[in-house]
């Protein structure tokens, strides 16, 4: 019997629900691109029940399991009322739990992992044809994700993966076990995708990897990441380049120089600290110490005095003492972060930290967490207040300001990554997402800036034109390029339709 595709009958609708890090956000763009290439249509907000719901899951946080199974339970009545509806579960939790998902939620139709996203359309068809769940988990990549089509969510900003997987062995992290060892894309491949996005009107690109500073080791060039940043500087129309996440143990001076000397590379750095205690860092197997971390920040600020530095911090790691925690506060005060993502330690089965002695009581972790948040907010507020009266360039965004409709403001990101809510003034109705505005900061809060005066300048952009027309950038798959920074891209055909930070 010949299997039919979704496009062979009336178009089926889909919805992707994403949990977790930027890797998952970008993977979800590829999932959407695959489904649309196979003939599915994205479900609108007003649609009753999508024909296919895909959960792209995270396995890093402790409540990831509860969140997934709670949402699956909420969908069961809809599935019972609509027998043709399909539910698929992918991502890191699917890679970890595998057939356990179907055992706990037998109404799930497809389970796929982090290494075989491209198989999703075929698995959906097979499950529908056989009226049985399809569970397919691979231990390594079947195709590099860059070969898959992508439906981008933003007209003005895009993610570009430079690598997948991770070679580090942090004791709290399950990501390497779920996404595998690091595999690097060739620079020519990365630059081809960046150029394709810019050709679609995208102004800002974020280079994405579990550890961007180890990029190039696979093909024998430990300075490849700095070269890649400089090569991005040669792409006409690319106004902003960001990257996430670097690892302090691999951070080199050539990257700092590339950031400082390449005009379109933003002076913003997100570099996870995790802990300020050397003893805790050793237990985490982080391979650097607080002195090195602060030394990198000192070099970054010497080269770029306006740099905004953000971080990740874990509180309550097994064995963390009060003295260890105080050392973390000391490093936070010295580093003066412009923002910090703070987390209470979450025990993940399968990680070395999960079986360590001296797991801390929840009340102790909560109390330290609250003190850390208070310390961070005091510093970020002070750092933001220094910008009152300064002119900032804002790339206008969608969905950044939760109160924009009530306040009448628009929102976007400054070049250093800070969130800015601004008054459009006499330009109300003319400024679109993707446009660029220059405005003056009038107020600072711990997590954002306000600019309530008349904008000083407004520049219409191709990204704004695309947003106004309701277009979304769609990029075909990009095949592996040559291991030479700046190598001219070769034409590539579209991919066949059958096809978290350290």
UniProtKB/Swiss-Prot annotation:
Protein keywords: 4Fe-4S, Cytoplasm, Iron, Iron-sulfur, Metal-binding, S-adenosyl-L-methionine, Transferase, tRNA processing
Q: Does the keyword Membrane apply?
A: no
InterPro entries documented for this protein: Elp3/MiaA/NifB-like_rSAM, Methylthiotransferase, Methylthiotransferase_CS, Methylthiotransferase_N, Methylthiotransferase_N_sf, MiaB_methiolase, rSAM, rSAM_horseshoe
Gene3D superfamilies hit by this protein: Methylthiotransferase, N-terminal domain (3.40.50.12160), tm_1862 like domain (3.80.30.20)
Q: Which SUPFAM superfamilies match?
A: Radical SAM enzymes (SSF102114)
Role, per record? Catalyzes the methylthiolation of N6-(dimethylallyl)adenosine (i(6)A), leading to the formation of 2-methylthio-N6-(dimethylallyl)adenosine (ms(2)i(6)A) at position 37 in tRNAs that read codons beginning with uridine.
| Family classification | Belongs to the methylthiotransferase family. MiaB subfamily.
Cite the record's note on assembly: Monomer.
Instruction: Write the protein's name.
Output: tRNA-2-methylthio-N(6)-dimethylallyladenosine synthase
The scientific name of the source species is Salinispora arenicola (strain CNS-205)
């Amino acid at each position: 019997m010949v299997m039919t595709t979704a496009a062979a009958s009336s178009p089926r609708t889909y919805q992707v629900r994403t949990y977790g890090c930027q890797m998952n956000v970008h993977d979800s763009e590829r999932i959407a691109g695959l489904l649309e290439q196979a003939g599915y249509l994205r479900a609108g907000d007003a649609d009753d029940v999508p024909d296919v719901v895909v959960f792209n899951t995270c396995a890093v946080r402790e409540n990831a399991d509860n969140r997934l199974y709670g949402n699956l339970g909420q969908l069961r009545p809809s599935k019972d009322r609509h027998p043709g509806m399909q539910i698929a579960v992918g991502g890191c939790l699917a890679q970890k739990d595998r057939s356990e998902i179907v055992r706990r939620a037998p109404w799930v139709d497809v389970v796929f992992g982090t290494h075989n996203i491209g198989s999703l359309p075929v698995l959906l068809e097979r499950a529908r044809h056989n009226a049985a769940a399809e569970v397919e988990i691979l231990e390594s990549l079947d195709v590099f994700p860059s070969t898959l089509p992508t439906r981008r969510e933003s007209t003005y900003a895009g993610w570009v993966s430079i690598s997948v997987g991770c070679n580090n062995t942090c004791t709290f992290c399950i990501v390497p076990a779920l996404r595998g060892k690091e595999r690097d894309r060739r620079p020519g491949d990365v630059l081809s995708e960046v150029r394709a996005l810019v050709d679609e009107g995208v102004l800002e690109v974020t280079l994405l990897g579990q550890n961007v500073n180890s990029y190039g080791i696979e093909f024998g060039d430990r300075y490849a990441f700095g070269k890649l940043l400089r090569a991005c500087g040669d792409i006409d129309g690319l106004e902003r380049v960001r990257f996430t996440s670097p690892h302090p143990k691999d951070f080199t001076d050539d990257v700092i120089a590339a950031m400082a000397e390449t005009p379109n590379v933003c002076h913003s750095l997100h570099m996870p600290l995790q802990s300020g205690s050397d003893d805790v860092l050793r237990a985490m197997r982080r391979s650097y110490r607080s002195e090195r971390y602060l030394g990198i920040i000192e070099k970054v600020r010497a080269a770029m005095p306006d740099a905004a530095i953000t971080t990740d911090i874990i509180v309550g790691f097994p064995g963390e003492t009060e003295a260890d925690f105080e050392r973390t506060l000391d490093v936070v005060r010295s580093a003066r972060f412009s923002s910090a993502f703070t987390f209470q330690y979450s025990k993940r089965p399968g990680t070395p930290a999960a079986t360590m002695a001296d797991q801390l009581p929840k009340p102790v972790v909560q109390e330290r967490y609250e003190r850390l948040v208070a310390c961070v907010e005091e510093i970020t507020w002070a750092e933001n207040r220094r910008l009152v009266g300064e002119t900032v360039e804002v790339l206008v965004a969608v969905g950044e300001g939760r109160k924009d409709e009530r306040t009448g403001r628009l929102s976007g990101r400054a070049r250093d990554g800070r969130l800015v809510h601004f008054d459009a003034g006499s330009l109300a109705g003319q400024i679109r997402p993707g446009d660029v505005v220059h405005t003056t900061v009038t107020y600072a809060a711990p997590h954002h800036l306000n600019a309530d005066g008349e904008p000083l300048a407004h520049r219409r952009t191709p990204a704004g034109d695309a947003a106004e027309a309701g277009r979304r950038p769609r990029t075909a798959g990009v095949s592996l390029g040559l291991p030479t920074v700046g190598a001219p891209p070769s034409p590539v055909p579209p991919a066949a339709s059958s096809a978290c930070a350290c």
